Amino acid sequence: MKNMLLMSGSKYQNTDYLVHTLPWLQDFLADYQGKTVAFVPYAGVRQSYDEYELKVQKALAELNVAILSVHRAEKHAEIIEKADVIAIGGGNTFCLLKGMYEHHLLPLIREKVQSGTPYFGWSAGANVAGRSIMTTNDMPITYPPSFDALNLFPHQLNPHFISGKPAGHNGESREERLAEFLIVNPTANVYALPEGTALHIQGQQARVLGQHDVLLFSENMQLATLPVNSVFDY
């Protein structure tokens, strides 16, 4: 049974890196004390993979799991194959997906998660769990072979969702960008995750976690609100 924790981002308000996720992860990894977590760092553009791995190790030290970045092996897939848990970090979603294609990780991760290996990711790491990365907020600074992602959650995700426009901003709002996507892709569903929220997916159900409701946008920008702690079939 699929068991995934898809988190909007690594911070909430003024909290330090990944601090607000620790209660969720403590529950999520309760049965994996002392186990190995394969970490995929490809989204980290402004830091080396070594630096990214260390940053996550320090942030999650109290969880009593071994964080091992896939770049530590010549064949990155080997670490995924042996891992008890899979984690994918945030950053640039295009770089992340390109790296996953280059190292042939998508079918392997998909198979392992469908077979029950826990998966958690934040920001870009949540985005790639969905059908495609077409609703990321990131600049396309590189070009993956396809926008198709893991499709473990067979819908679109939009992490870091914020409604409306900041004062003085004259570009498109997030709602306007998602409206554009739904005009071109009218059969899609987009789950918008505000900061401080997550989806805990178990099998074919998902629970909303965090401080805010999750929003579901569908054709013609129909809006459904998914309250905190609600459970829905997807």
Curated annotation (Swiss-Prot):
Q: Give the E.C. number(s).
A: 3.4.13.21
Localization terms from the record: Cytoplasm
Q: Which reaction does it catalyse?
A: Dipeptidase E catalyzes the hydrolysis of dipeptides Asp-|-Xaa. It does not act on peptides with N-terminal Glu, Asn or Gln, nor does it cleave isoaspartyl peptides
Asked if the keyword Disulfide bond belongs to this entry, the reply reads: no
Domain of life the protein comes from: Bacteria
Q: Which Gene3D superfamilies match?
A: 3.40.50.880
Active-site residues annotated for this sequence: S123, D138, H160
Q: Name one GO molecular function term.
A: dipeptidase activity
Write the record's keywords in alphabetical order, separated by commas: Cytoplasm, Dipeptidase, Hydrolase, Protease, Serine protease
Q: Which GO terms describe its cellular component?
A: cytoplasm
The record, for InterPro entries, names: Class_I_gatase-like, Peptidase_S51, Peptidase_S51_dipeptidase-E
Q: Name one GO biological process term.
A: proteolysis
UniProt cross-references to CDD domains, sorted A to Z = GAT1_Peptidase_E
Similarity field: Belongs to the peptidase S51 family.
Q: What is known about what this protein does?
A: Hydrolyzes dipeptides containing N-terminal aspartate residues. May play a role in allowing the cell to use peptide aspartate to spare carbon otherwise required for the synthesis of the aspartate family of amino acids.
Name of the protein this chain belongs to: Peptidase E
User: What is the protein's species of origin?
Assistant: Pasteurella multocida (strain Pm70)
Gene name tied to this protein: pepE
